Regions:
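Alpha-helical transmembrane segments
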Residues: 4-12, 231, 250-257
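Electrostatic cytochrome c docking/interface patches
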Residues: 44-69, 80-94, 98-99, 219, ...
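Acidic/histidine-rich catalytic neighborhood
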Residues: 54, 63, 84-85, 91-92, ...
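The canonical Cys-X-X-Cys-His
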Residues: 71-82, 231, 235
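Membrane-proximal low-complexity regions enriched in glycine and acidic/polar residues
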Residues: 107-202
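Post-cleavage N-terminal segment of exported redox proteins
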Residues: 1-58, 264-282, 286
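Extended, hydrophilic extramembrane loops/domains of integral membrane proteins
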Residues: 197-198, 204-240
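Juxtamembrane interface at the cytosolic side of transmembrane helices
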Residues: 246-305
Length: 305
């Protein structure tokens, strides 16, 4: 009786769940969907070509160094790189001495403790330090940015769909709001229209405003488009510094699996090929041939059939 009740209760739960899913599907199909302003005016990231795209992609070290320069001169005043250390810059091609100089000259000092008084203090950065945040805490960050919180950029390309393309599109996507944008969706005071941002308006003013804003050490023409691509590539590296190793490992695994599959197939053909060609006939005691042999043996022994 208890088992029967349990089965009935379980069936009841299954029925309720099935009905809920069915009703939700019917409602989704039958009822018209109201198109939001964000859905109408939001644009998907632009197509952006980067050297690290695809399974054979590799980082362009020169581009990463240019991107770091853009970050240092334009972005670092508001955005941190919490998970990146100064010494990681050696992977971009900087020498140990250059990294030490970059850390020592960084405009934001590292929080520390005064060994004599035990009070909070700051000190010059060293290569082992991570990039310091420009703000002491979230409250200070919001107070300095009209209550908007500047995100940390170390993992920004992994936290956003289409990663580097999104960052590139956002940096180059500032424009005047279209005339048909509803009044309630227009940017208010301290906000800027950008169709690549999810809700269309963001508190960050255009960071890249003119060609030549940064002077590249390698002589590359620093257009707004070039600077946006370079810093997007740099932020892709901060989020995935081992991307090249992962690509190489993935290719090696695919090659290994391909060879292993071929060898397994050849072994299968070698072992089972002759077995499949062999004809197997199952003969029992009631087969006419076996009955005749049995009768002959009985006669030879003088046994009556």
């Amino acid at each position: 009786m208890v088992r029967l009740i349990s089965i009935l209760v379980g069936l009841g739960f299954v029925g309720v769940a099935a009905w809920s899913l069915l009703w939700g599907a019917i409602t989704y199909v039958s009822e018209p969907h109201e198109e939001t302003v964000e859905h109408r005016f939001h644009e998907h990231p632009k197509e952006a070509s980067f050297s690290f795209n695809g399974p054979f992609g590799k980082y362009d070290r020169a581009q990463l160094q240019r991107g770091f320069q853009v970050y240092k001169e334009v972005c670092a005043a508001c955005h941190g790189l919490t998970y990146v250390s100064f010494r990681n810059l050696e992977e971009l091609g900087y020498s140990e001495a250059e990294v030490k100089a970059i850390a020592d000259q960084w405009q934001i000092e590292v929080p520390s403790i005064n060994p004599d008084t035990g009070e909070a203090a700051t000190r010059k950065a060293i290569p082992a330090d991570r990039f310091p945040s420009p703000y002491a805490n979230e409250v200070a960050a919001r107070a300095a940015n009209n209550n908007a919180l500047p995100p940390d950029l170390a993992l920004i390309t992994k936290a956003r769909h289409d990663g580097p393309a999104y960052v590139y599109s956002l940096l180059t996507g500032y424009r005047q709001p279209p005339a048909n944008l509803p009044a309630e969706s227009r940017p208010g005071q301290g906000l800027y229209y950008n169709p690549y941002f999810p809700n269309l308006n963001l508190a960050m003013p255009p960071p890249l405003t003119a060609d030549g804003q940064v002077t590249y050490a390698d002589g590359t023409n620093p257009t707004v488009d070039q600077m946006a691509k370079d810093v997007s590539a740099f932020l892709a590296w901060t989020a995935e510094p081992r991307l090249e190793n992962r690509n190489r490992t993935g290719i090696a695994v695919l090659i290994f699996l391909t060879i292993a599959t071929i060898l397994a197939y050849l072994a299968y053909k070698n072992i089972w090929g002759s077995v499949k060609e062999r004809k197997v006939r199952i003969a029992g005691p009631l087969e006419p041939e076996n009955i005749a042999r049995s009768d002959a043996a009985k006669r030879d022994e003088g046994i009556a059939g």
